[in-house]
Amino acid sequence: MAKKIDGYIKLQVPAGKANPSPPIGPALGQKGVNIMAFCKEFNAATSNQEPGLPIPTEITVYSDKSFTFIMKSPPAAYLLRKAAGIAKGSGTPNTAKVGKVDRAQLEEIVKTKDADLTAADLDAAIRTIAGTARSMGITVEGV
């Protein structure tokens, strides 16, 4: 028989840096999950990724206080900021441009996010990421 699901928790956790401090500790503590067990499993699962890379994580908590988690790909905005070499997006994206990315960089981002994108083909996925870049004030070349 399948376990009864008690709830879901969605968090963005830095790769390899999960610890019991906020926001992880309080979120898991409310559901009665063993916080250190999650931190150890998450850090082991993200040990092959760049430390500090924000990983959106969906944790399923069961009624017996056990858990499973699914890791998604890093947010497009983070990957775009990294590719453009900027600290943050523009406050006024239509007038003030803060960085520049080209098609090759967008293709790399699409390959990273491939599993989480719902686009039909590569060009549609690139256009999706390019739209995110434009809304951040990043100039897109070659699209």
From Swiss-Prot:
Entry annotated with the keyword Transmembrane: no
Name listed for the protein in its UniProt record: Large ribosomal subunit protein uL11
An annotated Gene Ontology molecular function: large ribosomal subunit rRNA binding
CDD domains named among the record's database cross-references: Ribosomal_L11
Family: Belongs to the universal ribosomal protein uL11 family.
Organism listed in the record: Psychrobacter arcticus (strain DSM 17307 / VKM B-2377 / 273-4)
Pfam families per record: Ribosomal_L11, Ribosomal_L11_N
GO CC, any one term: cytosolic large ribosomal subunit
PROSITE patterns listed in its UniProt record: RIBOSOMAL_L11 (PS00359)
Record gene name: rplK
Upper lineage: Bacteria, Pseudomonadati, Pseudomonadota, Gammaproteobacteria, Moraxellales
